[in-house]
Every structure is written in C-alpha cells, then in structure tokens.
C-alpha cells in the first residue's frame, strides 16, 4: 500500500496536480503561448526553437510566412525573438507585490527604419491584462521604441516625433525628428512601472 501511495505521489505533478507549487519558466510559458500573441509562429515553431536551444543549435525556425524567425535569447525569465527583419518581440517575467508573476510583451516593428513599439501584459495563463494597470504611456503618440533591461527590469521608452515622408513631388524635406527618452523601473511594491526621477 505504501508503495502505491508513493507512486501516486510521484505521478501527481505529471497529471498537473500540484503543478502550481513551482513557478513556470518563460520557456515553459513560451511553449504554451497562444498563437494570437505571435501569429506567425505555430506551436510546432515554438517547440522547434526550444528544442534547438536544448541541442545547442541556432534557435531558428521557418515561420508561417516561410521566412526565418530567430530567438536571440531565451532564459527562465527573458526572451528576445526576432520575427523578421522588421519585427521583434521581447518577453519579460515580472513579479508583483503579492508574488504573482506576469508576462510583459514588447512588440516592435520598423516603419521606414523608425521603431514603433507596443507593450502588453499577460497572466501566466496568457490572459490579457489591462496595460494601464502596469504602465502609463508617455504623452506623445508617435513612434516609440521600448526596451527592457533583462537584469534590472528597467524599461526605457524612446519616443520620436518623426514627420511622415509622404509628398506628392518629393520636394518636401522632412525635418529632423524630436526624440524624447523616458526610463521606468519596475516597482514590486506598487506592481507597476514607475518613471525614474
């Protein structure tokens, strides 16, 4: 009887019972990520990236657009995915004041070599969270590049007020863009990013 109880106790984590007792790594969550978060990567593509890392290969896969996407870095709490030459995503695990972990996803596209980023937050079950609960955007609504320091969780937002380069005859010279940089730090106590002074 003791032997049977011992076998059941060992098998419970495999069945998902007690699985919440250990924190999931970003690698695990990347594999479970819904395709809506990164539509060009199928479940197979994500599995191939993680398998390539385990086998010390380039973490690259042919995505659904039949071009290559490459994971530049994948750790237990940070990931940097280059989707195409004009698109990338960064993932960072953050801890709130109650110990709950959330995932921040920074999506960046290049528009005429000017980066434009958006930030989204998710639970570890990949349920979308309200961004304004964790981060307030700078007041300028033009192009922004958002980066995160994977070690300190410091968020840097560079906003560029760049003019459009559209003109009928090509005679309008674009003026130099105005650039503003704001730096935020993650506050576990407040469970949100706070603008550095």
Tell what function each PLM region has:
Residues 1-28:
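Bacterial Sec-dependent N-terminal signal peptides
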């Amino acid at each position: 009887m003791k032997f049977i109880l011992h076998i059941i106790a060992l098998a419970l984590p495999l069945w998902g019972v007690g699985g919440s007792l250990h924190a999931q790594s970003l690698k695990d969550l990347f594999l479970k990520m819904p395709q809506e978060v990164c539509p060009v990567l199928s479940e197979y593509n994500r599995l191939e990236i993680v398998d390539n890392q385990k086998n010390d290969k380039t973490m690259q896969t042919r995505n659904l657009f039949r071009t290559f996407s490459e994971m530049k870095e994948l750790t237990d709490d940070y990931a940097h995915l280059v989707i195409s030459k004009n698109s990338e995503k960064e993932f960072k695990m953050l801890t709130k004041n109650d110990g709950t972990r959330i995932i921040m996803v920074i999506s960046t596209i290049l528009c005429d070599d000017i980066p434009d980023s958006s930030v989204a937050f998710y639970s570890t079950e990949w349920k979308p969270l309200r961004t304004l609960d964790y981060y307030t955007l700078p007041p300028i609504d033009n192009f922004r590049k958002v980066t995160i320091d994977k070690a300190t969780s410091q968020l840097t937002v560079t906003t560029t007020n760049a003019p459009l380069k559209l003109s009928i005859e090509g005679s309008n010279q674009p003026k130099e863009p105005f650039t503003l940089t704001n730096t935020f730090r993650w506050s576990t106590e407040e469970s949100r990013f706070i603008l550095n002074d």
